[in-house]
Swiss-Prot record:
This is Large ribosomal subunit protein uL22. GO terms for cellular component: cytosolic large ribosomal subunit. Keywords: Ribonucleoprotein, Ribosomal protein, RNA-binding, rRNA-binding. The lineage of its organism: Bacteria, Pseudomonadati, Campylobacterota, Epsilonproteobacteria, Campylobacterales. It comes from Aliarcobacter butzleri (strain RM4018) (Arcobacter butzleri). Gene3D superfamilies: Ribosomal protein L22/L17 (3.90.470.10). Part of the 50S ribosomal subunit.
Length: 110
C-alpha cells in the first residue's frame, strides 16, 4: 500500500469531497479516465494525486485500486473586499488536504 498527500491546495474541501467519494474503491486507471471528463477544479487535482500515489507504489495503473480517498479541511485564507463608505467585507478562501491510498488489485477487485 502506498499513498500520496497534497496539502494546502486552494480548492473547497466540500466540493473536493464529492469527487473523492466517487473514486474510492475504483481501479486507478478507470478513476483517472473518468476524472478527465469531470468539469470540476478538484477533479484535475485529485487525478494528479492518484497518479502520484500509483507511482509511489511502483504499480501499473491497471493493477492499482484506490483503497482510501480522503479530503480534510485546511486553513482558511481571509481576505477583504472594499465596500461602500470605507467599509470592507470578508472573503473566505478555503484550502484542503487531499490524501489518496492505493494498493495492488486482487482478482476480485478488477
Amino acid at each position: 500500500m502506498a499513498k500520496a498527500i497534497l496539502k494546502f491546495i486552494r480548492v473547497s474541501p466540500i466540493k473536493a469531497r464529492l469527487i473523492a467519494r466517487e473514486v474510492q474503491g475504483m481501479n486507478a486507471e478507470y478513476a483517472i479516465a473518468s476524472l478527465q471528463f469531470t468539469p470540476n477544479k478538484a477533479a484535475g487535482i485529485i487525478s494528479k494525486v492518484i497518479a502520484s500515489a500509483v507511482a509511489n507504489a511502483g504499480l501499473d495503473p491497471v493493477d492499482a485500486v484506490i483503497t482510501s480517498a480522503r479530503v480534510d479541511k485546511g486553513p482558511v485564507l481571509k481576505r477583504f473586499t472594499p465596500r461602500a463608505r470605507g467599509s470592507a467585507s470578508p472573503k473566505h478562501k478555503p484550502t484542503a488536504h487531499i490524501m489518496i491510498e492505493v494498493a495492488a488489485a486482487t482478482k476480485g477487485d478488477k
